[in-house]
Amino acid sequence: MRIVFMGTPDFAVGSLQALCESGKHEILAVVTQPDRPKGRGNKLLQTPVKEYALAQGLTVYQPQKVKTPEFVELLHELQPELIVVAAFGQFLSKEILELPKYGCI
């Protein structure tokens, strides 16, 4: 199945890992929150989902807002059959929720 995965913290990595290891799905893209400065030096830190996705060679997108027309158009172009969301951190518009053939979970 053609899947777009949306998630950010450690909690979401397990779900992405299970999808990758199943060997039954094509992960079209991983969408996660933008890198944020943390710590004393305000060093930009990648999200746990981004770290895992890059290690797997997956395409990663980090939009400030997923509701922008540009990002919605990108999702249309990817043509996912399913969007899997795990602790993503942004509300998805009705248009995004209805875009995949099998919806969003």
Regions found by a protein language model. Name each.
Residues M1-I105:
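One-carbon transfer enzymes
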